[in-house]
UniProtKB/Swiss-Prot annotation:
Lineage: Eukaryota, Metazoa, Ecdysozoa, Nematoda, Chromadorea
Single GO BP term: backward locomotion
Gene3D superfamilies: 1.20.5.350
Tissue distribution of the protein: Strongly expressed in body wall muscle during embryogenesis, reduces during the larval stages to adult. In late-stage larvae and adults, expression is evident in the proximal gonad of both hermaphrodites and males.
Protein name: Troponin I 1
Originating species: Caenorhabditis elegans
């Protein structure tokens, strides 16, 4: 009795069930941990597959590059403007106050100085233009040679011409060739008849009713053809030949 009481008091059979529940819970906990670990590994693999440049990072990088390009363009334009102002300041000369000068010799000297300076600038401009045209022609020739070696054909720069200009030119040439040419000759001739002529032609072609009735009566009263024997046909043919001979003799 004492052992049974102790088992009942300290849990006995209940201890076995509690141990099974604890074991099952531990297994469930381990399974949940393994599932969470697996999910974390999959998420890490997905992040690794995406790489460093995610769409958000690409967007930010594109924005930064655009801002940098805009800043560089502004600085380049400012630098060019400063260089232009500097070159103009070096090349241009401050004009003297001509209104306050009364001496003719001084005015003539100023005029000669400015004129000689202008001539020099025009010569430099002509030389620069000549050099640029030569370089452009050489570049074009080299491009043509390179394309020929590669086997490519460069489209020539075609001039835009209005189609109406060509039409007017052709018309002018045709007028020069045939000055007295009548355009009505090319038109199609259509024969027109008046109403009166149509009625007259209709009357000529139509037969009167009394003639139509006569023809119908003749057709009705006409005898039916009779088939004659062969001997009668031969006698008729001989009689016809004799009549023809008599007619020839007469």
């Amino acid at each position: 009795m004492s052992q049974i009481d102790e088992n009942i008091r300290y849990g006995g059979a209940a201890n076995e069930t509690d141990g099974e529940d604890a074991q099952r819970k531990a297994q469930e906990r381990e399974a949940k941990k393994a599932e969470v670990r697996k999910r974390l590994e999959e998420a890490g693999q997905k992040k690794q597959k995406k790489g460093f440049l995610t769409p958000e990072r690409k967007k930010k990088l594109r924005k930064l590059l655009m801002n940098k390009a805009a800043e560089d363009l502004k600085t380049q334009q400012l630098r060019k403007e400063q260089e232009r102002v500097k070159v103009l300041a070096e090349r241009t000369v401050a004009l003297p106050n001509v209104d306050s000068i009364d001496d003719h010799a001084k005015l003539e000297a100023i005029y000669n100085d400015l004129f000689s300076r202008l001539c020099n600038l025009e010569e430099e401009k002509y030389d620069i233009n000549h050099i640029t045209t030569e370089t452009e022609t050489t570049i074009n020739q080299l491009n043509i040679e390179v394309n020929d070696l590669r086997g490519k054909f460069v489209k020539p720069s075609l001039k835009k011409v209005s189609k109406y200009d060509n039409k007017f030119k052709k018309m002018a040439e045709a007028k020069k060739e045939d000055g007295s040419k009548n355009l009505r000759n090319n038109l199609k001739t259509v024969k027109k008849e008046s109403v009166f002529t149509q009625i007259a032609n209709k009357k000529k072609s139509d037969k009167p009713e009394w003639s139509k009735k006569k023809e119908e009566k003749k057709e009705e009263s006409a005898p039916e053809p009779v088939i004659e024997p062969v001997e009668e046909e031969e006698t008729a043919a001989s009689e016809g030949e004799e009549e023809e001979e008599e007619a020839d003799e007469e």
